[in-house]
Curated annotation (Swiss-Prot):
Involved in conjugal transfer of the plasmid. Pfam families: Peptidase_S26. Transmembrane segments: none annotated. Gene3D superfamilies: Umud Fragment, subunit A. The gene is traF. GO terms for biological process: signal peptide processing. Residues 1-28 form the signal peptide. It comes from Sinorhizobium fredii (strain NBRC 101917 / NGR234). GO terms for cellular component: periplasmic space. This is Probable conjugal transfer protein TraF. GO terms for molecular function: serine-type endopeptidase activity.
């Protein structure tokens, strides 16, 4: 079948604006996502803190009690097991784990006691009851307690199902990416 040259050229011209539009939208989307990523924006899909858009705000001081932080957990057997059990999501931190959003409730030199719930320097931490088993009935092993070492932090989330320092103990403060700032969030 012969298609006249004029008709073939006309079809090519009609397809070019569509391709150009798709390419432009794709580049704009990639640019926006890249700018957001490098600007410190992250999406939280875990129930430990409100769902939605968060921002990592750099800090130029040591972390303090009360700071809500983004932190990369260390590469430990406890973290690998937590990832395998589904407590932690995949991400870009060492060990392939996503950063955690948690509150710092104890810093170096503070005494943490873990029993039915958590006490820091003899003061009870609200919403810190321990779970003996996870949602699938598997046993949970709590941290035994002790003094938070130098350059470490003890983390907590008030969400009852949170996997935090109640179970894995203090972790290196060097993993802190920055303060966690809510941008556009929703607390279910």
């Amino acid at each position: 079948m012969n298609i006249p040259l004029v008709e073939l050229t006309s079809r090519r011209r009609r397809g070019k604006p569509l391709l150009l539009g798709l390419a432009t939208m794709t580049m704009a989307a990639v640019g926006t996502i890249s700018a957001a990523w490098f600007g410190g924006y992250r999406i939280n899909l875990t129930p430990s803190e409100p769902l939605g858009l968060w921002r990592i705000v750099k800090i130029d001081r040591p972390s303090a009690v009360g700071d809500l932080v983004f932190i990369c957990p260390p590469r430990t057997s406890a973290m690998r097991e937590a990832r395998m059990r589904g407590y932690l999501r995949a991400g870009l931190c060492p060990g392939g784990i996503a950063p955690l959003i948690k509150s710092v409730i104890a810093v170096a030199g503070q005494r943490v006691e873990v029993g039915v719930s958590v006490n820091v320097d003899g003061h009870p931490v609200p919403s810190s009851a321990l779970a003996l088993r996870d949602g699938q009935g598997r046993p949970m092993k709590p941290f035994s307690g002790g003094i938070v070492p130098t350059d470490y932090v003890f983390l907590h989330s008030p969400f009852s199902g949170s996997y935090d320092s109640r179970y894995f103990g203090p972790i290196p403060a060097a993993g802190i990416l920055g303060l966690a700032q809510e941008v556009l969030t929703y607390a279910p």
